[in-house]
Amino acid sequence: MASLNPSAKELHLLYVLTDSNLPTGGFVSSSGLESFAKHGFLSSQYSYTPKEFKDGVLGKKNMTGGLVDFARAEVSNYASTTGGFVMDGWTCVNDSRKASKAGNGIIEDEVQRVLQKIQALDKYHECTLLSHVGRRSSKAQGVAMLTLFSRGLSRPVGIDEYLNEDGGGPGSTDELGVKIVEGYKKMVILEKAPGHLAVCWGVITAALGLPVDRALHLHLFLHARSLLSSAVRLNIIGPYASSQLLLHPYRDIINQEVEKLSNCTTGIIEDKAEKCGEEEDLWAWTEDAEKGPATTWPLGEVLMGRHDIQHSRIFNS
């Protein structure tokens, strides 16, 4: 859990990760916004949400209001489908780092054990994404994040005399964390793991020492910001309107979803040892299903799946 008063190192790491110049691959994806707009839902004369009823008549909406409605539905769906994977990916690496610092086990053995969990988590994420468009976008951004860690977030070579780091705290990467990320990247290159963004983000933020709640919040913030960047590139709104939306209505949307993710999990990396000896419950699978990822906006998934049939398009999703 993050401190209410983050350290200077943690703040600096957050500033680095929120830099819009970082090559994260997010510019290739509109998260379904392009297809949503092309199918006429965003530019419809009347609002499509029940909340806009006035005296039994749907009220007119402007483009910025449509983007807020879109973000409310899309960010909620994104949080529900990816939050558990960020949490579990982060937990795998963080628990391993704690065990390593306590002197438990050999690093190479620990790395392989964690990589097996990450591989299973990543393959499960592949199964939960409903369209080939969503999978393609997630993998492209995941690979970009792994590359960013290796080339842009690792310690620079040859300037140790200029660094004043004690090897701990947010932003520092220990040997185990680096080996896990590099091992995961190798699995993705060898096509032994898909390399989805949510899993990559959880693994990388844990390796950097970022608290999990900040990792989840930043995960949704960057996603919401990319929606607005896509809207600007699609000429739906201008850059000033984008900043207004991100500062005001999107803040509440993000905070609401972050609160829901406080105990999120996929349920597939839990330690089952404590359940041994207990009588098997016929309906135990329903509890696991409730914990796992879920699609909350089917319309958005359908429209994203139709992205490739557009006659012209800017983004790959």
Swiss-Prot record:
Organism encoding this protein? Cryptococcus neoformans var. grubii serotype A (strain H99 / ATCC 208821 / CBS 10515 / FGSC 9487)
Q: What happens when the gene is disrupted?
A: Fails to grow on agar media with urea as the sole nitrogen source. Leads to the inactivation of the URE1 urease and reduces the efficacy of brain invasion in mice.
| InterPro entries in alphabetical order | UreF (IPR002639), UreF_sf (IPR038277)
Q: Which family does it belong to?
A: Belongs to the UreF family.
- Report the protein name in the record: Urease accessory protein 6
Alphabetized PANTHER family for the sequence: UREASE ACCESSORY PROTEIN F (PTHR33620:SF1)
Q: What does this protein do?
A: Urease accessory protein required for the maturation and activation of urease via the functional incorporation of the urease nickel metallocenter. Plays a role in host brain invasion.
Q: Which gene encodes it?
A: URE6
Pfam hit, one: UreF
Could you give the subunit structure recorded for this chain? URE4, URE6 and URE7 may form a complex that acts as a GTP-hydrolysis-dependent molecular chaperone, activating the urease apoprotein URE1.
Q: Which UniProt keywords apply?
A: Chaperone, Nickel insertion, Virulence
